[in-house]
């Protein structure tokens, strides 16, 4: 989270508050479920879910203060259909969907 805060601090000092945030990062591992390790699972979840959470949390601070802003999060069709050989990716994108919809409902009136 500190690296995200630092990057946003530098950007806002130079350019001002963030108007639009696009969460578009993601990784997947092409590994069968039986060969999946907790480390591999955590790597995908950390980037795909925690990355969205951390970046959105910092960007939203400025947006809420100003009373405006747009947050877009890309996901994937496999978030609802699943995919073999990469269970963490669809799970992470399902989590991004839930995070984004919940955040939209919470912040729509702020």
Task: Give the residues covered by each predicted segment.
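Alpha-helical segment proximal to the catalytic Tyr-Lys
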Residues: 61, 105-109
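Residue(s) in the substrate-gating loop at a strand-loop-helix junction
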Residues: 76
């Amino acid at each position: 989270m500190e690296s995200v805060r630092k990057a946003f601090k530098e950007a806002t000092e130079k350019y001002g508050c963030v108007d639009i945030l696009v969460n578009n990062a993601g990784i997947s591992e092409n590994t069968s479920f039986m060969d999946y390790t907790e480390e591999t699972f955590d790597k995908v979840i950390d980037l795909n879910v925690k990355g969205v959470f951390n970046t959105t949390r910092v960007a939203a601070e400025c947006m809420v203060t100003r009373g405006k802003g747009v947050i877009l999060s890309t996901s994937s069709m496999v978030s609802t259909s699943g995919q073999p050989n990469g269970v963490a990716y669809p799970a992470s994108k399902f989590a991004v969907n839930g995070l984004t919809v919940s955040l939209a409902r919470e912040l729509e009136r702020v």
